[in-house]
């Protein structure tokens, strides 16, 4: 539902209650409560008794700031004050939308160089319900034109659908280079992600001794190197300058 900050929260709480009583509890609803203040979001969720989810404006703001600040942004703080950190089961995550694109009243576009990393941050982690922006997938024409990211997004969507499962372990220990791993499900291979907002770098991360000797490659093609997991289950996963890499087992 759009622009719910202009609608009384008491009404919204009871309205969604009535809708779900008629349509069933699995009738999904989320709202655009356009407010980046952490406490305001916490209070609103309490007022509506968490009967529907909210778009994560705070995370979008963090992604926008990260894209404009470049290497001056501390990537270890990318989820600070966000809904997905405070209320992961009620956060609808997004990178950009029709309000934040260039030329709009709430313009706060995530710069193109950072969009692949931003989408990896919402698509390949265990928390939040991610949304793709039409303009990012298909591109935007006209005065405020933007290239499309369809090829990159298709690869990230494949990784989410087939690889992004299991325990998540974060390696947020460097302001300019972060990473995380997903252990995979019983039938799938693990996944590793590295992001840099500065120079080329690498991140030592544990995949597990069961995968010792296996070779990993970057499915985004941003790093041509491969990574071999050592006998203790660790690998040194590189990332190019101001880039993102998504690593999985090479067939």
Description of each model-found segment:
Residues 3-251:
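Active-site-proximal helices and loops of the catalytic beta/alpha 8
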């Amino acid at each position: 539902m759009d622009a719910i900050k202009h609608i009384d929260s008491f009404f919204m709480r009871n309205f969604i209650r009535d809708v779900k009583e008629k349509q069933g509890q699995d009738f999904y609803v989320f709202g655009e409560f356009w407010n980046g203040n952490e406490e305001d979001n916490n209070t609103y969720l309490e007022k509506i008794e968490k009967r529907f989810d909210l778009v994560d404006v705070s995370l979008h703001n963090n992604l926008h700031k990260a894209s404009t600040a470049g290497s001056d942004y501390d990537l270890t703080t990318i989820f600070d004050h966000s809904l997905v950190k405070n209320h992961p089961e009620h956060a609808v995550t997004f990178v950009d939308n029709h309000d934040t694109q260039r030329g709009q009243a709430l313009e706060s576009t995530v710069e193109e160089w950072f969009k692949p990393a931003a989408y990896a941050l919402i698509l390949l982690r265990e928390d939040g319900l991610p949304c793709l922006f039409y303009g990012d997938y298909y591109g935007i024409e006209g005065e405020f034109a933007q290239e499309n990211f369809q090829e990159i997004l298709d690869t990230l969507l494949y990784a989410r659908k087939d690889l992004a499962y299991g325990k998540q372990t974060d390696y947020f220990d460097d302001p300019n280079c972060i990473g995380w791993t997903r252990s995979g499900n019983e039938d799938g291979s693990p996944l590793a992600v590295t992001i840099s907002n500065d120079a080329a770098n690498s991140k030592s991360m544990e995949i597990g001794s069961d995968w010792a000797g296996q070779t990993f490659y970057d499915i985004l093609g941003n790093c041509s190197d491969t990574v071999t997991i050592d006998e203790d289950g660790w690998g040194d996963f590189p990332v190019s300058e101001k880039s993102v890499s998504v690593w999985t087992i090479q067939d």
